[in-house]
Design a protein with these regions (language model features):
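Walker B catalytic motif
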Residues: 149, 178-180, 411, 440-441
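ABC-family nucleotide-binding domains
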Residues: 177, 183-184, 188, 439, ...
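Conserved ABC ATPase "signature" region
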Residues: 128-145, 389-407
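Conserved beta-strand-loop-alpha-helix hinge in the C-terminal portion
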Residues: 228-258, 479-480, 488-492
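Conserved ABC ATPase signature
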Residues: 149-153, 384-387, 411-415, 419
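ABC ATPase nucleotide-binding domain signature region
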Residues: 44-121, 317-381
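Hydrophobic anchor residue at the start of the ABC signature
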Residues: 162-163, 425
């Protein structure tokens, strides 16, 4: 049987990319694989080995994509990574740039330009390619986003563009890291159905890298478990399902009690009204994002913000976090102060702990992880002043709460994407904020870490004067403390 990929006793040439033992693996024609395992277990290193990203000692992987295949491995394999959902790899990007459109270079590509370039790699003839393009655009409902600069898209909109870009080139093998993150329920169902059809028709083969065992779809034929830097043997999906018993581990009692007894950073909260918006409208060009929104968040309330991709959730959070310059033209008060009344952005941010998909993109400096965590105390991206020993002790304590002890000195960019997300969550908590603003905080986390973080959020919010605003597309991710919900509708 045809072997699309074959590796025999593979060992990465560079020590920092090595797994614990040599890897032997074959991907046969007709197989669709799920790669599963805990955060930091080695899944990304295994995929890098499959794609030939890192040279091996001895023989490199062999590839056979069949007659008529393209000459380059990279043309036959498309790999959508977790971090791709945060944008193009642009070193000039900064966290608030999405909300400062006047500073965007016109050379920055639009979504349409990026997708049109992908059409050049399509295996089908021109007419079939255009038909396929129209089908994907309609299925994922992206027409309204095509002429937006790529860095202006929400994380969910950007995720759709990345997926469509890969599908337009019709690769022989498509690898997707956490395919459903950032997508609303409708888009997840559409993608799941489309991938199932493509696998059934033999149009491509699929490797899904999954943090959630319950997201292994029925069109997956085999599963490879990667844990403790070991690649286990490939097994049939039914065999894996019969032996798999995934469950999140509750927060250890010791950690829960330590968190409840943690000294407060401030003796008093700043205001009874944390957020107040009156008739707030936000527009970009001809498109209305928020229209006449009235919203009040009081001290100690815990809000879920829901809505489909592109409904304005991230825009709303940019107003709460003082990142959006349009807030000065709106009737918005934060922590009892009207925007534009003389308070600085940093006067507002010192009360807020924040994490989001966009933040993940902004962290490209390969600093020690504890420095990334410590930057949350100064609200900087990166580390611009040396933390004191007391601040470092506080960072170590919070890393222990989140189970990241031992990662303090590891370079941030050497962590797995799930571990990076945990580190950015620690950064949000490290100054014991009055207000937690969490935009899809459980992205890419395995079952155990999802439960742990959910318990930490719940326990943190049991403390006095703690307010929460949380965005998610998965209702099961919301902690029990949620007592209010705001649902946004996408404006046409």
């Amino acid at each position: 049987m045809q072997k699309l990929i074959a590796i025999h006793n593979g060992v990465a040439r560079l020590p920092e990319w090595r797994l614990a033992s040599p890897v032997s693996f074959e991907l046969l024609e007709g197989e669709n694989i799920a790669i599963v395992g805990p955060n930091g277990g080695g899944k990304t290193m295994f995929v890098d080995m499959l794609t030939g990203s890192h040279p091996l000692l001895g023989d490199n992987p062999t590839y056979d994509f069949g007659p008529g295949s393209k000459p380059l491995v990279s043309d036959n394999i498309k790999y959508i990574q977790f971090t791709d959902s945060y944008g193009e790899n642009d070193s000039t990007y900064y966290l608030q740039q999405r909300w400062n459109q006047q500073e965007i270079d016109e050379s920055t590509p639009t979504a349409r330009q990026i997708l049109d370039s992908a059409m050049q790699l399509a295996r089908a003839d021109a007419q079939r390619a255009r038909s396929w393009q129209a089908h994907l655009y309609a299925m994922f409902d992206i027409e309204h986003t095509l002429d937006k600069h790529i860095i202006l898209l929400s994380s969910g909109e950007l995720r759709k563009i990345q997926i469509i870009k890969a599908l337009l080139s019709m690769p022989r093998l498509l690898i997707i890291d956490n395919p459903f993150i950032g997508l609303d329920a409708t888009a997840r169902g559409q993608l799941d159905g489309l991938l199932g059809e493509l696998c059934h028709d033999g149009a491509l083969q699929l490797i899904l890298v999954l943090a959630k065992y319950n997201e292994i779809p029925p069109y997956i034929t085999h599963v490879v478990n990667v844990a403790d830097m070991e690649v286990k043997a490939k097994v049939e999906r039914s065999v894996f399902a019969s032996s798999c018993n995934p469950s999140g581990v509750s927060l250890p009692r010791e950690v829960e009690q330590a968190l409840l007894q943690h000294p407060y950073r401030a003796s008093e909260h700043s205001a009874d009204e944390v957020v107040r918006m009156k008739n707030v409208s936000i527009r970009y060009g001809s498109r209305t994002i928020l229209d006449g929104l009235d919203w009040m968040v009081r001290n100690g309330e815990h809000w879920a913000v829901t809505g489909k991709n592109g409904s304005g959730k991230s825009t709303l959070l940019s107003l709460v976090c003082a990142d959006n310059p349009q807030s000065y033209a709106c009737d918005i008060s934060l922590f009892g102060n009207r925007r534009g009344s003389g308070e600085s952005i940093w006067d507002i941010k010192r009360h807020i702990g924040y994490v989001s998909p966009e933040m993940h993109r902004a962290y490209k400096k390969n600093l020690p992880t504890i420095n990334i965590v410590a930057s949350g105390m100064k609200e900087s991206v990166g580390q611009y002043s040396n933390p004191t020993e007391a601040e470092l002790d506080n960072c170590r304590w919070w890393m222990w709460v989140f189970g990241l002890q031992g990662c303090e000195d590891r370079p941030f960019l050497k962590l797995s994407s799930g571990q990076q997300r945990l580190a950015l969550l620690v950064r949000a908590f490290v100054k014991d904020p009055e207000l937690l603003v969490l935009d899809e905080p459980l992205h890419g986390l395995d079952d155990g870490n999802r439960q742990r973080v959910k318990d930490i959020i719940e326990t943190f919010c049991r403390r006095k004067n703690k307010t929460l605003i949380m965005v998610t597309h998965y209702m099961e991710e919301l902690p029990p403390c949620i007592d209010h919900t705001l649902t946004l509708e996408r404006k046409v």
